[in-house]
Amino acid sequence: MANSDRAEGLRVSQAEIAKMIAAAEIIRDCRRDLAARNSNLVDEVTRCATICAWLHYPDGEVFDATSHAQYFFHAHAPDSRPPTERGHFHTFLRAEGMPGGVVPLLLPELAVANVATPPPQAAPLKRGERDEVSHLIAIAIDVHGEPIRLFTTNRWVTGETWYRAEDVTRMLDRFVIAEAEPSAVVNRWIGAMIQLFRPQVAALLLARDETVMAWRRRRRTHVFEDPRLEITSSLDIQLDTQLALVDGARDRPDEGAFRRVPALPPMGEGWEEGHAG
């Protein structure tokens, strides 16, 4: 994504706006539910357990057998994560739930990892008959249980099957978790977050592909397995700001409001030069 594109902003269609408005209502419902029970997203998904680094929560992860959407929450060791972050959700769509026509990007280097000691991997459990799985977006949560950042990762991080950004964007609408466990409110919230921030997620996926290809050209490494490249794009977010933008679009539907959302700033942790976090 060129610098000029980032400066101008991200175009948002009327169809996307409608989905974002609906998602905003779900987010508000989830907030009210959690507040009424004096709970938060992390406590819900971990059932108030002490968080152990690298363990996936809940036990067995969350998988919807109808949509084939999947997610888990985990945290890195305290010395390897930002001090404001408590952990993050990784979201996926498995092969059986993908739209028609999506094709994995297969390169010979995918099977090569010339690393003496590979870093920890956060691969999802296999569910369903097929192996292919796409990582959609990760959502970082702060110590208060609020979302603070969206980010994408290199292939080795989750062991995913690599699909082009445009194909992964087509998968976003198919992330639906209708299950009640471990928490119906968390399941609804994650799906709504993907829709509420859909323009930003799509832009992050495009940035992910640019980061990976730029790294590959400059460093001539097996990029998908290179542990030096972990975070491929990231964006700090403020939920209340996004909700206010959506409210503006809803209150002024005839004025072309919210045709654009704020542009992505220069990415950290992997953006362009691929500095892993």
Tell what function each PLM region has.
Residues 110-227:
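Conserved binding-pocket/active-site segment within a compact domain
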Residues 57, 74, 273-276:
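Short amphipathic alpha-helical "recognition" segments used for binding
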Residues 5, 124-126, 141, 270-273:
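Compositionally biased, low-complexity repeat tracts
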Residues 11, 89, 140, 147, ...:
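Compositionally biased, intrinsically disordered low-complexity regions
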Residues 60-148:
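Aromatic- and glycine-enriched beta-alpha-beta binding-site module
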Residues 1-65:
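N-terminal domain-onset segments
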Residues 184-277:
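Long, compositionally biased interface segments
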